[in-house]
């Protein structure tokens, strides 16, 4: 191999610098994590002023596309160029995107600027955990990984009320403007606390790998986003995007095998620890969306509670996850990585098993307790995956392996939304054909016009019928004689459909638990030495004099 660039590291920062740095990391982590939940709260006001209801979801999709794609790229650039320059660049991009979002006067502009925000957010997402991996080893590293995991979970709890307060007290534009002063404070602390790295040797950035990865990942995410919604799964648009994705990813793999400084070294996947941990993280995220997306749907559509009440059911789950993230980061030194992840995945799967018992008479307390079981399992697993990866690879690969865990979890979340949504749509449509269509022939003849319309909807737009469960106004337009027959069938069909979704989630998480059995023993602690098996393309860091 030709001359290879190495990064020089200074001595560990002083306690004062470390305090400034950790404060900056906490501020940056919170305001970046809060952004997603706060923006969701402001969405109705944004649409009310700018219009664009039909493209509203692209405010989330644009951010997701760019942030997910940037995560592995940021991790590698942090290894090549140093943490400080990459992190501060991400902060600046995020702040610029936020200000532009606040100044926008059209929904199209806002979507573009959300994509710019996502680039900054995708750089910031892995950097805090990478820097924690640099600063600490052993139990201290585990403790801080748990703390930052808890902070990320906390953002989902406090985000909606904070967003609502900002929108009510000021206006929706301040949801974005508020990022500027907070971001400046975080940048100052990080700039003061984070030591500069001196790069020796030529910097060889894998531009071909970056390009093919962006094309491959974005095309795949767009196909998953469009499939079954804007376009049919076998439409030329979706098939075309998947074809582009496959070709680009194949090209990416070929490039990564040959380049000196690959964005994601392909031979890492031959490492059992790397593959198993990221596989577990991917499957956990796929299954997780069975709870996050579909339990509120169940409680609103079947049980009949309000959106705010169904949202409140999620809060105890997140609080349980936060608590077990912190406790689990300490327990892992007693239990070991393999045992703790296995126990966490089994607990999470058990929670999904409980969800399959829910019915029309399920109480909020029952649903909340089931969600807390899932949160308990998630908290035991999520921070440990990143910790175990950091403890298993040399420091020069810390950026790559840390960002990989976040990347595969993000991709898993997207797959989860798509797979579980498709399962629900397919099952619910077939159930209406089985249950509702025969019932229509028994309805009074005076309701023939409405009956014919419903029969057509069963074949052309079954989800439109289910949406009536979430709209009392729409249901009131249906004649009472039809409504009394229609509502029980719709609820029964939704219960069966969501039971299938929860069973699929159960199976996916259980596969993740089985995959954990392939994990070798992962020693933890500062005295641990990295084995040759885990060292891939390793070059020792050059210590700055």
Description of each model-found segment:
Residues 188-207, 254-263, 360, 426, ...:
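Helix-loop junctions on the cytosolic side of multi-pass membrane transporters
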Residues 18-71, 75, 109, 151, ...:
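Transmembrane core module of solute transporters
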Residues 2-21, 25, 251, 387, ...:
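Transmembrane-helix exit segments and adjacent C-terminal regions of multi-pass membrane proteins
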Residues 181-198, 214-226, 244-258, 513-520:
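C-terminal membrane-cytosol helix-exit motif in multi-pass small-molecule transporters
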Residues 29, 91, 95-98, 113-114, ...:
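A generic transmembrane-helix signature of 12-TM secondary carrier transporters
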Residues 48, 71-209, 213, 226:
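Helix-loop-helix hairpins in multi-pass membrane proteins, especially solute transporters
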Residues 158-160, 367-456, 502:
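Small-residue-rich alpha-helical segments with characteristic i,i+4
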